[in-house]
UniProtKB/Swiss-Prot annotation:
HAMAP family: NaMN_adenylyltr
EC number: 2.7.7.18
Keyword ATP-binding applies: yes
Family the UniProt entry places it in: Belongs to the NadD family.
Pfam families the record matches: CTP_transf_like
Protein name: Probable nicotinate-nucleotide adenylyltransferase
Pathway(s) the chain acts in: Cofactor biosynthesis; NAD(+) biosynthesis; deamido-NAD(+) from nicotinate D-ribonucleotide: step 1/1
Organism: Sulfurovum sp. (strain NBC37-1)
Length: 188
């Protein structure tokens, strides 16, 4: 009998507002070290923990398509954006479990302080392995997590810093002009 198991995937969700070279590093390293068939980059329609946005969901999705295009095993999915509302992580994991076996959820260490407040945290904690990306100033505290892996990334900037300081050094040339225009238009 042929094994009909589902492809194993990791989900890397986020605002990607804007996506930058650090996100590319995370994706490339995750594909290298995780035993997965596919990595799904999942831009959020609206992050329930954030209220300031540089770009609309469609623009952020477009940037993600451009930025992650050509990286083996990586797909950008518009599931959350198509919902036209904030989508909880557990809902997305359940959605993708219909087609795949969601094995990993990639998060920044800055999320750890609020992780237990996530909707259905216990369910998530029982069903996935957390892949924690190191972020400066945010210690990796794994108390309460059932299964986790650390993804060491030494990247000096965040999307928040890029938005606040208008610092485009860490924006890939594929999307730099568009991000610059969006920042300029937002100021006016």
């Amino acid at each position: 009998m042929v094994n009909q198991s589902k492809p194993e995937v990791a989900i890397f969700g986020g605002s990607f507002d804007p996506p930058h070279k650090g996100h590319q590093q995370i994706v490339r390293k995750a594909v290298q070290i995780l035993d997965i068939d596919k990595l799904i980059v999942l831009p959020a329609y609206l992050n329930p923990f954030k209220n300031v946005s540089l770009a609309n969901p469609e623009k952020r999705l477009e940037w993600c398509y451009q930025l992650f295009d050509g990286i083996p095993k990586v797909v950008v999915d518009d599931y959350e954006i198509r919902q036209n509302k904030s989508v909880r992580t557990s809902q997305s994991v359940k959605h993708f479990n219909n087609t795949y076996s969601v094995k990993y959820l990639i998060i920044g260490s800055d999320n750890l302080s609020t992780l237990t407040k996530w909707h259905e945290f216990k369910w998530l904690n029982d069903h996935i392995t957390w892949v924690i990306v190191t972020r400066k100033g945010h210690p990796v505290q794994t108390e309460g997590l059932k299964s986790w892996r650390i993804l060491e990334i030494d990247f000096p900037i965040s999307s928040t810093t890029i938005r606040e300081k208008k610092d485009l050094r860490y924006i890939d040339n594929k999307i730099k002009q568009s991000v610059e225009k969006t920042i300029k238009d937002k100021k006016e």
